[in-house]
Amino acid sequence: MTNIRKSHPLIKIINESFIDLPAPSNISAWWNFGSLLGACLILQILTGLFVAMHYTSDTTTAFSSVTHICRDVNYGWIIRYMHANGASMFFICLFMHIGRGMYYGSYSFMETWNIGIILLFTVMATAFMGYVLPWGQMSFWGATVITNLLSAVPYIGTNLVEWIWGGFSVDKATLTRFFAFHFILPFVISALAAVHLLFLHETGSNNPSGIPSDSDKIPFHPYYTIKDMLGLLIMFTALMTLVLFSPDLLGDPDNYTPANPLNTPPHIKPEWYFLFAYAILRSIPYKLGGVLALILSITILAIVPLLHTSNQRSMMFRPLSQCLFWLLAADLLTLTWIGGQPVEYPFIIIGQLASILYFLIILVLMPISGIIENHLLKW
């Protein structure tokens, strides 16, 4: 009799994806982040579902409903904070996952990489709309500032903004539609993640050396299931430490003040995971230019495969490219710091220099280093 996991139409798919999947024998802990992202997504959908049971998407009651969740609902506080800090863990894993892809040349799997970029945009949109829902000061003003960026679109900009708002300002209609989209998008993300995996399993995983590993594959289970479980344990420990000891560490104190359209906070800023893009946006004094730079800061990932000039796929044996990669990582941390600072000297100039360096490394220095390394190998 054939084993049911190999014959049953549905179980067979799970078997080929997570059990008998041939995986390279040398993939490191950097390959754990894919499964961690899946775990984060499941956690966010579950906690979000329970939060949504008690949340009301009305401007008069939204803030009170979040307070009610934290004070009156059984374990509401832990569900709410797991959802809020779960988003931070999601983005930490996302950035690590993308960084891994850039370092080891995983972007040469073009379909997988491009679906990943679409996933990144979708997750960012979902997180932004989720930040608006508690209807605190930073929720309201963050929504106003970010949606207003669309007014930079020539000719149709103003109409576009009012269409998204559902009125002439961020109000009840905006909050209701943001809640609707915030609820539906995680399911879209789940579908995209399935397509992402589908394309990945067409080619098989990359590995740290960047060379084909078809001659040396091992089954995913038990080797990588146990490895993923360890990663999951570490991430969950970090998340629960954050939730139970300092749940508001990554939040903004202004969001504990109910939204007031008549009172602007001294410094409007998004959540920490958007600060690098926000810093790039602010570094250009011209509105349309800033918006284009903001969009380009993410879409630039799509042209990374086209800028690959090295004869080697991975950066494992390319010290010059490694230096540039870690310089880029440091630059992104600098941009994140700058995004949270007020618009004044010396932060303005630091932000502008960091923004220039960001694009310079990806568009110019990385391709040049690849060419130099090719020549060094011939010596």
Curated annotation (Swiss-Prot):
Which InterPro entries did the record assign? Cyt_b/b6_C, Cyt_b/b6_C_sf, Cyt_b/b6_N, Cytb/b6-like_sf, Cytochrome_b, Cytochrome_b_C_euk/bac, Cytochrome_b_N_euk/bac, Di-haem_cyt_TM
For a ubiquinone, which residues are the binding ones? 201
Cofactors (names) = heme b
> From which domain of life does this come?
Eukaryota
Q: Where does heme b b562 bind?
A: 83, 182
Q: Name one Pfam family in it.
A: Cytochrom_B_C
Q: How does the record classify its membrane topology?
A: Multi-pass membrane protein
Q: Which residues take part in binding heme b b566?
A: 97, 196
One CC-aspect GO term: mitochondrial inner membrane
Q: Sorted alphabetically, which keywords does the UniProt record give? A: Electron transport, Heme, Iron, Membrane, Metal-binding, Mitochondrion, Mitochondrion inner membrane, Respiratory chain, Transmembrane, Transmembrane helix, Transport, Ubiquinone
| Residues passing through the membrane, by range | 33-53, 77-98, 113-133, 178-198, 226-246, 288-308, 320-340, 347-367
Location comes to: Mitochondrion inner membrane
Which GO annotations describe the biological process of this protein? mitochondrial electron transport, ubiquinol to cytochrome c
User: Which PROSITE patterns does the UniProt record give?
Assistant: CYTB_CTER, CYTB_NTER
Q: Which GO terms describe its molecular function?
A: metal ion binding; ubiquinol-cytochrome-c reductase activity
Describe cofactor binding as the record notes it: Binds 2 heme b groups non-covalently.
The function of this protein is: Component of the ubiquinol-cytochrome c reductase complex (complex III or cytochrome b-c1 complex) that is part of the mitochondrial respiratory chain. The b-c1 complex mediates electron transfer from ubiquinol to cytochrome c. Contributes to the generation of a proton gradient across the mitochondrial membrane that is then used for ATP synthesis.
Q: How does it assemble?
A: The cytochrome bc1 complex contains 11 subunits: 3 respiratory subunits (MT-CYB, CYC1 and UQCRFS1), 2 core proteins (UQCRC1 and UQCRC2) and 6 low-molecular weight proteins (UQCRH/QCR6, UQCRB/QCR7, UQCRQ/QCR8, UQCR10/QCR9, UQCR11/QCR10 and a cleavage product of UQCRFS1). This cytochrome bc1 complex then forms a dimer.
Other known facts: Heme 1 (or BL or b562) is low-potential and absorbs at about 562 nm, and heme 2 (or BH or b566) is high-potential and absorbs at about 566 nm.
Q: Which family does it belong to?
A: Belongs to the cytochrome b family.
Q: What is this protein called?
A: Cytochrome b
What organism is this sequence from?
Answer: Mungos mungo
